[in-house]
Each structure stands twice: as structure tokens, then as C-alpha cells.
């Protein structure tokens, strides 16, 4: 996965844009972060990229209304729960089933 530094991004943030990880500071990005972003790339591919971003935004807004917190909304999203829950498992993507993130939509935390 390609990792790109962008001075417009906060230092400890990383965003996956169409399979490219973008961060304000790339020195903190390790194998686990790269694996996390690769999981997002798999999610994007199965949704054909643009619908992923639309669903991601809609789910974040719904979770924000339910959680009243930007960070809690982010961490409770199905896409993020799959990625955070499996980013330490470097073999996860080989075993991952298609649309695995759907299993996290209504699953309690």
C-alpha cells in the first residue's frame, strides 16, 4: 500500500483515499496501521469505491446523532469496527469474507 505525507492533514491522522493512505506524518505508520487501511481498501473495492464513501458518511452521521461524540461515532462505525478489530491480524485479509463489515452494523459493542 502506498503511504503519502500531506502537510494539510493532522499529524496522527490517516485517511485512505482510493487505496492510498494519506497522513500528516508518516513516521508513526506501522504494519498495523497499513493493515487497517488495507482492510478499508478491501471494503472499498467490494462497494466500488464511491458508494463506500457515501455509506461511510451516512453511517458516521447516524452514529454521531446516536453517540453525541465525534470519536465515539467514528469508533462505532461498522467499517471501523471491522478494521480496528482485525488490524493486528496480518493474515485477516486472506481469510476475510466479502462484505464482512455487514456483520458489525447491528452487532453490539
Show the residue positions of the predicted features.
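Short secondary-structure boundary segments
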Residues: 1-7, 33-40
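Activation segment
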Residues: 42-43, 87
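Short pre-active-site segment immediately N-terminal to the catalytic Zn-binding motif
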Residues: 13-34, 44
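Metalloprotease/metallohydrolase-associated module, dominated by Zn2+-dependent proteases
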Residues: 2-12, 48-109
